[in-house]
Amino acid sequence: MKKHIFEDARAIAAFLVSVFDSRLKTQEILWLALSGGSTPREIFRTWAHEFRHHLDWKRLRFFWSDERCVPPTDAQSNFNMTHSALLEPLEINPDAVFRVRGEDAPESACAAYSQEIEARLPRQRGVPCFDIILLGMGADGHTASIFPHEIELWDHSGCCVVATHPDTGQKRVSFTGHLINNAHEIYVVVTGREKQDMLASVASDPHASVPLHAWTLPKRSGCWIPLLRGLYPRKQCKPTV
């Protein structure tokens, strides 16, 4: 994995815009899956206000790597956060937005989202292929909504699964490793000192039973982990391969 250190969310936002722009120079549509959380919110706001004229946002198609099973107006909804921070300010056409129907029964929402992805995305090796997937990592090593206590869901053969939060029992719809590993590029944004030990484990422990350790990308895929500077002591803040 390659690792980049960024000063703040704006620097990550600028980096990702350059990634999007590079892809849009060689293709008409960019298929993008987003994540939720506080850091993505700041990135999305920066895109909407500082980079709105740097990119033809109408050529992006928006999906989510995971979603809580709540209505789209709920404060916990990843779609709701993205809509207010990014989609609405940029006046993105609803036809370019593909959300999980979190208000439906979890199994129904999961099946419908899997079908949407299967029907719309281009395919590589017989599997739907996103151009770019943005992910985060929890302090327990989870990514999307695949938690360590349900690590077997990572290897599910479908595009999406119904996952359960280990503490609250809340149901979520999540991408699987089957779908994530097939993306052209994947970027994991990790912030917070509380994640330092887990990130070190993911990077060095071959037996770590966390989803990101099961992340086996083809060599053609750019596997980057953008980090905010506060994650590590200053002396460790340098790009590595």
Swiss-Prot record:
EC annotation from Swiss-Prot or TrEMBL: 3.1.1.31
Primary enzyme class: hydrolase
Name recorded for this polypeptide: 6-phosphogluconolactonase
Pathways involved: Carbohydrate degradation; pentose phosphate pathway; D-ribulose 5-phosphate from D-glucose 6-phosphate (oxidative stage): step 2/3
Annotated gene: pgl
One Pfam match: Glucosamine_iso
Reaction catalysed by this enzyme: 6-phospho-D-glucono-1,5-lactone + H2O = 6-phospho-D-gluconate + H(+)
Transmembrane segments: none
Keywords, comma-separated and alphabetical: Hydrolase
Lineage per the UniProt record: Bacteria, Pseudomonadati, Spirochaetota, Spirochaetia, Spirochaetales
Protein role: Hydrolysis of 6-phosphogluconolactone to 6-phosphogluconate.
GO molecular function: 6-phosphogluconolactonase activity
Similarity remark: Belongs to the glucosamine/galactosamine-6-phosphate isomerase family. 6-phosphogluconolactonase subfamily.
UniProt GO BP: carbohydrate metabolic process; pentose-phosphate shunt
